[in-house]
Amino acid sequence: MDRLIYTAMTGANAAASRQSVIANNLANVSTNGFRAQLATYRAVPLRGEGATTRVFALEATAGHLDTAGPAMRTDRSLDVMAKDGAWFAVQGLDGTEAYTRNGHVEVATDGTLTTGNGLQVLSSDGSPITSPAGAELTIQPDGTVSAKVGNQPANAIGRLKLVVPTPEDPLVRSGDGLFRA
């Protein structure tokens, strides 16, 4: 009886975990920049005397789907898409640098550029990008952010920090949904 309970328990835990991952993926299917989570499981036999018939379910691969979703034209000057595997650098809620593929940029009331969920967008030097009051902003294909105030010519106020992870230093999903090196 003992063997059956533990085998059933680990199988049920794996099924619940898999269902949670699938539900999260479905709930976020239309979220800008979302990366679907992956989870696979394998059977692991327990070693030891009298335990040869015990098998447990163990998560074998936890990761994320790293393919870009479809590009959608929004005709909004602050909507951008990182190309060629690049990620936008943002300041996470814990103050550390984190990465996202969400290119929906907004201007906060204090003038800083933020993501749709309020995280500050970082410039190539690692500092937040701040816009002058009342400026009309544009983002160039190379990530340069320009501000035009009134009839004055547009001036570059920063450049989006883009990070391309390598196989030697991959990004890992954090509990907050952001990625970190």
Predicted regions and their residues:
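Amphipathic alpha-helical polymerization modules
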Residues: 1-181
